[in-house]
Amino acid sequence: MKTTVRQLVTALGLTFVVAAGAAAAPIPELVTKDGRHALMVDGAPFVMFGGQAQNSSNYPLALDKVWAAIKDANANTLEIPVAWEQIEPTEGKFDFSYVDTLVAQARKNKVRLVLLWFGTWKNTGPSYTPEWVKFNNARFPRMLDQEGKPIYCLSPQGEETLKADKKAFVALMAHIKKIDDVQRTVIMMQVQNEVGTYGYARDYGPKAEAQFNAPVPAEVLKHKKSPVALAATGTWKQVYGDYADEYFHAYSVAKYIGEIAKAGRDVYNLPMYVNNSIRDSLEEPVKPWNKNFASGGPTFDVIDIYKAAAPAIDFAAPDIYSPDSRKFVATLDKFQRPDNALAVPEMSNGADYVRYAYLVLGRGAINFSPFGIDYADYSNFPLGHKATDKTMTAPYGKIFGAFRPMERQWSKWAFEGRTYGVAEGDDRQPQKLALKGWNATISFREWQFGEAQYFKDVKDLPANTEKPNGGVAMAQIADNEFIIVGQHARVKIDSADGKPTMWARVEEGRYDAAGKWIMERNWNGDQTDYGLNLTGNPVVLKVKVGTY
């Protein structure tokens, strides 16, 4: 018998009723200790080994292709949109059947959810707003350019727009609470998507102009000092000079988002964050906006302004679509702060990016989620992978498959500051990690046997190393014990005090469901004489070292 969407939702409703009799799990929350952060799920640290669906897969009949890709990627979390246009196509009339279907299917697939609220802004534009918003400029005003002409972007000064978006978001949060207050399948919310404005520094409408020419709010002055020697107080231009337009726009957008987030959290207090299309992380010194990124978005230079204007937002996170290794590392450096959790909620799914899983996870991130983990017939090449099949998901599946059996242990170690990570740089050079009492050297393009100087006439290089794709993540679980997972890399560990060092034991294995280490074999001889040589098939090693 063919099952209709109505029948499916009815059946799902029964599932929710049954679940309501169970004891509620603790609500997810973001916690901070000693400048480190953890997402607590079911009362314990939880790292999202995730994947983000395509933008148009947020409909019940499209989900099968999403779940298939998430399964092949071995992901524990799906990020997927919930669009304003789909839950409130007619003003005041809400339809949450998609949300019901999504949550029920996530439970069936044993996957957690991060819901992406595509409301007023998606990639700076209003394309996911309902039609009754899109075409009513009188009620829902667009930003105005310097000549007073409306542009593509809805104004953050639009009071009616804010009121309507907030109403829809609150209704969504209330519904999530209704169906998920026990099982906590939904663990986090993204509020809007890649906000700001391309090509325009800010809104020049009457309300915006009045605020721009008024004194900078005290909460902003407290968080964001002037990058140049200007007035300590005054108007935006007086305090921030050439940076004033971007900073004011960031404040306006952040305040708008913050009001929506707070209203939603007042109903159901899930963690919430904002993402952004990043600016050049290598630019030093950071220059004023010059049409080179989305002005007003939560780029690294205005995180402080977002903290001031939107305290209901837990953190700002980068969407990364540049494979340049120096920029990637610099971006993580800019966003990983004592007051800002590191997360990469969106990244290219291209082959050049796979190696960064080890770097991001090793640095203690709470989320690593490539974009387009979805078998829908759409490829975002050249930003992403050419194909939308298993050739795209398999590399992530191998890595996540290595981490997932120890996901709770890894999450705990990361929160305790015990984890480290590297990704092979574009220069292909060895990298060092300063561990507690030890130094690790990670090199790349090495054969498993011998040292390069032994075989100077050998010109061959290991297969699949034509481009940088190596990486290693480590956790120091005791003074002289480590968990190592990686690919296409050689790992050596030496004592930090210079004493001769040797391997005491190198076990290959895994953690079982109860958290017990299961050894499959012990490496020795050729497998350890020249460091620990990791191939393209990620393995998990439990390593003990000593000095003599």
Feature map (PLM): residue ranges:
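Aromatic-lined substrate-binding rim segments of carbohydrate-active enzymes
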Residues: A62-F140, V253-N269
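Catalytic-core region of carbohydrate-active enzymes that cleave or remodel glycosidic bonds
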Residues: V111, G258-L270, D301-Q409
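C-terminal beta-sandwich/jelly-roll accessory domains of carbohydrate-active enzymes
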Residues: R445, F449-M474, D479-Y548
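The substrate-binding groove and active-site-proximal loops of carbohydrate-active enzymes
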Residues: M48-N58, P81-V99, Q146-K167, I179, ...
